[in-house]
From Swiss-Prot:
Chain residues that bind Mg(2+) 1: D10, D143
HAMAP family assigned: RuvC
Protein name: Crossover junction endodeoxyribonuclease RuvC
Keywords, comma-separated and alphabetical: Cytoplasm, DNA damage, DNA recombination, DNA repair, DNA-binding, Endonuclease, Hydrolase, Magnesium, Metal-binding, Nuclease
UniProt lineage: Bacteria, Bacillati, Cyanobacteriota, Cyanophyceae, Gloeobacterales
C-alpha cells in the first residue's frame, strides 16, 4: 500500500501533461503512469474541453490520487492564457468531483524545488526528474516530464520541513 499517490498536471488545451507517482515513507518515488492528453486545434473549443474532462476523469478513476499538483497559470499571451485557464478549470472540477485536494505551483517554484534554481532550463528539470525517479531515459514528451516534476514538487511541499532535508534534490540551494 502506498503512502500517497500524487497526480501531477501540466495544463494545456492542445497538450496536457500528466504524471502519477506513488510515495512511500522512506523509499524513492514510484512512477505509476505518465503521458499526455492531446486535442486537435481543428476541433471546436468546447469539444476539446469535454475531451480533456473525459480523459482526466478517467485518470482520476483509474489511479485514485490522494492529491493533485498542478502548475499555476503563467501569463504570456492573453488568448492562450485564457484557454489554459479554462482547461485548468476542467481539471479542478474533476478533482472536486472526486474529492481530491489540490496544490498549485508556479514554474519557478517547480524549478527551484527540483534544481535549486528558479530559472533552470527545461533540460535541467528533465535531468532532475530522470535522476529522482531513477529513470533510464528522460520522460517524453516534455509536457509529461513537466507533470512528473510538478508531482515531485507536490510531494516535497507535503513533507514536514525536517523531512525535506533528507531528500537530495530538495536540499540543494
Amino acid at each position: 500500500m502506498c503512502g500517497m499517490r500524487i497526480l501531477g498536471l501540466d495544463p494545456g488545451v492542445a497538450i496536457l501533461g500528466y504524471g502519477v507517482l506513488d510515495f512511500f515513507d522512506s523509499a524513492p518515488p514510484v512512477v505509476c503512469d505518465y503521458g499526455i492528453v492531446q486535442t486537435s486545434a481543428k476541433t471546436a473549443f468546447e469539444a476539446r474541453l469535454a475531451a480533456i474532462y473525459e480523459d482526466i476523469n478517467s485518470l482520476f478513476s483509474a489511479h485514485k490520487p490522494d492529491l493533485v499538483a498542478i502548475e499555476k497559470l503563467f501569463f504570456y499571451k492573453m488568448g492562450n492564457t485564457i484557454s489554459v485557464a479554462q482547461a485548468r478549470g476542467v481539471v479542478l472540477l474533476c478533482a472536486a468531483q472526486h474529492g481530491v485536494p489540490y496544490v498549485e505551483f508556479s514554474p519557478p517554484q517547480v524549478k527551484l524545488a527540483l534544481t535549486g534554481d528558479g530559472r533552470a532550463d527545461k533540460r535541467a528539470i528533465q535531468e532532475a526528474v530522470q535522476r529522482e525517479l531513477g529513470l533510464i531515459t528522460m520522460p517524453k514528451p516534455d509536457d509529461a516530464a513537466d507533470a512528473l516534476a510538478i508531482a515531485l514538487t507536490g510531494w516535497f511541499h507535503h513533507l514536514p520541513p525536517a523531512a525535506r532535508e533528507a531528500v537530495p534534490a530538495y536540499s540543494v540551494g
